[in-house]
Amino acid sequence: MMLAGKLFRDGQDNSGEVLDSNDLERERGITILSKNVSINWKGTKINILDTPGHSDFGGEVERVLNMADGCLLLVDAFEGPMPQTRFVLQKALQLGLKPIVVVNKVDKPNCRPEEVYEMVFDLMCDLDATEEQLDFTVVYGSAKNGWMSDEDRKSVV
């Protein structure tokens, strides 16, 4: 999204964790403090909010989600939903948000996008998602390689 929104200048290095600016966050590969970045996409301003996933940061998650109009649920195509996914997704669903599910890393060997899709659906059912929330949009792709597709999940692998 940040590439598409032209957050970076041509030729600017955009590798790494853009929103994880804290040394401890970069070292551990986790988000501790919520961050935001704004992009413009086809005349619409989109604020991207990165929240911590762990329940120890619950207050931070709730504070940020209360400002959101929607959410992206980013899930690894091999690992599927992680334990912290449950906590943040539950908070988002309770606030009435309808996630767009992003299954990332479908370019990796042994990825399981079909199974991960089912795992996300089952998790949302376990969290008492509404019928509307269960009718979520899903996209598949590789953030590392800079592409996403809303094609049928079997055709992108």
Describe these PLM feature segments.
Residues M1-P81, V88-L89, E115, M119:
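P-loop NTPase switch module centered on the Walker A-proximal segment
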